[in-house]
Amino acid sequence: MLKQVFTGLVIVLASSSYAQDPGQQLFTDHCASCHGTDGNGGELGPNIATRVPLRSDAELATVVSQGLGAAGMPAFPAISANEMPALITKLRALKLRFGSAPERRELVLADGSTLAGLVLNQGNDELQVLGDDRRLHLLRRVDQRWRAVTSQNDWTSYNGELHGSRHSALTGINKQNVTALAPAWLFNFTSNNNLQTTPVVSEGVMYVTSANEVIALDAGSGREIWRYQRARTRGLIGNGATGANRGVAINGDRLFMLTDHAHMIALDKHSGTLLWDTEMADWRLNYNATGAPLVVGNLVIAGTSGGDEGVRGFVGAYDQSSGREVWRWWSTPLPGEPGSETWQGPGIAHPAGSTWMTGTYDKALDTLYWTVGNPGPDMIGDDRLGDNLYTDSVVALDPATGKLKWHFQFTPHDVWDYDAQETPALVDTM
């Protein structure tokens, strides 16, 4: 009897508390089941206590009312405009279980100007600030003031340059001082033991990845600035399930990345805020992704993995602003299409030809180059007699339309799993 009375008392007190705090009631009804009762993350949703300070009230209201689409967050149109301020107040009151939320400060810079914004991280002589201009500012102490720092040269893609040379024009390291190189800082990944990331640098910030995770670091100190992370995909098979991810591409204020389950996402490079999320292919059909995208003009271009699991490979191009697919080039033909005569037997139904390595681009020729992996199954070709176009090939595509210009096949009818997966390095010869 006492237990029943006590339980009833708790329910009454809780109901009374919610009645006095409509924001808490809204959070409990619509947010807590995914993001946890304290907003620090749950089984179905990420930690939002760290993300709320990075958005304005208007941005928060838009996210709540419209959702985040393919990212998995539904829209909540039933929350009225009159109720929204109470919910936003509750969101702004969320506390981290560990660490502290970003602190707002106004700083005097060495040139006498001021900078106001959120301090995302700091050391004794350094600050990483998300300014009110919504841009990242890296600062170093000069007496009682601060000076801005940035990178001497950016490396904004997997290969550094669109033509794939991976050549750096920096001259700070040379024959005379190379023997004196020593570690400057160390950053430890805690979420992955299969690192394949290429660090990308933009405006003094280094971006590194593991599966479904991007971390922004102060390139001068290695201090973490922000982290975007989403849960690994349960039930995924193939290379994407190993945790491999080769990095990001940056253009302007946007950062582009592939997820393990073959989604292309765009983030704000200053705050890590998700801008859009587009499904390239259905992971339930064994598609996955491990590569780094390539930016060409107003498009961001990438391929997928999954050939060893029987998928049909393709290269896709997506609008940088919206994530809308603009074109798709399939690496193997369907029955009856040109090239299908090089597939004799039932193997054309599960042809492989994955496109997981990053391509290159020749601006003078306005041509995109991409490489294609092995046919499937790898070692047995009895069900796929013929050359098996366009597997084990390099293809030249029109970057605006995806139309094939030409191809060269390195290994017709590959039964050795040779692939042709490498970055095409473009050179001018005499």
Regions found by a protein language model. Give the residues of each.
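Short coil/turn segments that connect the beta-strands within blades of beta-propeller domains
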Residues: Q152-N153, E203-V205, G252-D253, G297-L299, ...
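Conserved beta-propeller blade signature
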Residues: V205-T209, I215, L255-M257, I301-G303, ...
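Blade/loop signatures of beta-propeller domains
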Residues: V149-P183, S331-P338
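A detector of repeated loop/turn-to-beta-strand junctions in beta-rich toroidal repeat architectures
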Residues: G45, H261, V311-F314, L389-T391
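Extracytoplasmic beta-rich repeat domains
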Residues: L186-V200, R227-A249, D277-A292, E309, ...
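Extracytoplasmic electron-transfer domains, predominantly the class I c-type cytochrome c fold
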Residues: S33, D38, G42-V149, W155, ...
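Short loop/turn segments that connect beta-strands within beta-propeller blades
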Residues: D218-S221, D268-S271, Q320-S322, P399-T401
